[in-house]
Swiss-Prot record:
Keyword Transferase: yes
Binding site for Mg(2+): 32
Segments forming domain Pterin-binding: 25-271
Name of the protein: Dihydropteroate synthase
Record pathway: Cofactor biosynthesis; tetrahydrofolate biosynthesis; 7,8-dihydrofolate from 2-amino-4-hydroxy-6-hydroxymethyl-7,8-dihydropteridine diphosphate and 4-aminobenzoate: step 1/2
Gene (UniProt): sul
Length: 285
């Protein structure tokens, strides 16, 4: 597959300021304002608690806060657009006003993404890669904001896992570009834990370099996921070390953004990996 040379500056065009992933791995801290997320459901569902947790994550090294109002865990309850908006919009407005940090909205609904960006979010993080809601790519294009296109599919009906994943992701890219999304605003996510078996997830982790080889920035979202729990035989809240191992491998294989719950530990690991890999061409310290 031909490599794209998208944006030599290696910048994600966020607000209030753009973020460079050339010299450091960007850490995206997860803020779930849901009652039923697999890892932290119900913990941050009040405005004050959500704001406090966002501030803690920024202090711990997060560059982006990813806010989600509907759990994406398998079997989670679907919520209406109105309910999702009522959860995320006040949090986005408050964090934008008080913390001034780039915010990502974790949604696959175009109407929610639209309102979230108007409220201050500057990245759309879509677990369906602009394939679930036909208006999603247009919303990203209209607002000229980055969009994370995650790999996903309704069934695990692969002929050949990795080539099929690349093909699926490039379909998402095509949808986005045809809707008017600037290629510099496209971020890819291999979708660890979505429509993949335990062995699929390990195989994808082992070949992450093929995704960074497409020429777009890559977001890796492995935090506390089930395949880590299966390897370590540990519950979600005890998977920070396992998550750290996946993040270190991901950074070595060219991932640019890591989406995590355990920001303090992972931000330190990312900084150490960046130094050892001489990311940005300047030795740290």
């Amino acid at each position: 597959m031909a490599q794209h040379t998208i944006d030599q500056t290696q910048v994600i065009h966020t607000k209030p300021s753009a973020l460079s992933y050339k010299e450091k791995t960007l850490v995206m801290g997860i803020l779930n304002v849901t009652p039923d997320s697999f890892s932290d459901g119900g913990k941050y569902d009040s405005l004050d608690k959500a704001l406090l947790h966002a501030k803690e994550m920024i202090d711990d090294g997060a560059h982006i806060i990813d806010i989600g109002g509907e759990s994406t865990r398998p079997g989670a309850e679907c919520v209406s657009e109105d309910e999702e908006m009522s959860r995320v919009i006040p949090v986005i407005e408050r964090i934008t006003k008080e913390l001034g940090v780039p915010i990502s909205v974790d949604t696959y609904k175009a109407s929610v993404a639209d309102e979230a960006v108007k409220a201050g979010a500057s990245i759309i993080n879509d677990i369906w890669g602009a394939k679930h809601d036909p208006k999603m790519a247009s919303v990203a294009a209209e607002h000229n904001v980055p969009i994370v296109l995650m790999h996903n599919r309704p069934e695990r009906n692969y002929n050949d896992l990795l080539p099929d994943m690349l093909s699926d992701l490039m379909e998402s890219v095509k949808i986005a570009v045809e809707a008017g999304v600037d290629e510099k605003n496209i971020i890819l996510d291999p979708g660890i834990g979505f429509a993949k078996t335990y062995h699929d997830n390990l195989a994808v982790m082992n070949k992450l370099e093929i995704f960074s080889g497409l020429g777009y920035p890559v977001l890796l979202a492995t935090s506390r996921k089930r395949f880590i729990g299966r390897v370590l035989d540990l519950p979600p809240e005890e998977r920070a070390e396992g998550t750290g191992a996946t993040v270190c491998l991901g950074i070595q294989k060219g991932c640019d953004i890591v989406r995590v719950h355990d920001v303090k530990q992972i931000a330190r690991m990312a900084k150490m990996m960046d130094a050892m890999l001489n990311k940005g061409g300047v030795h740290h310290g």
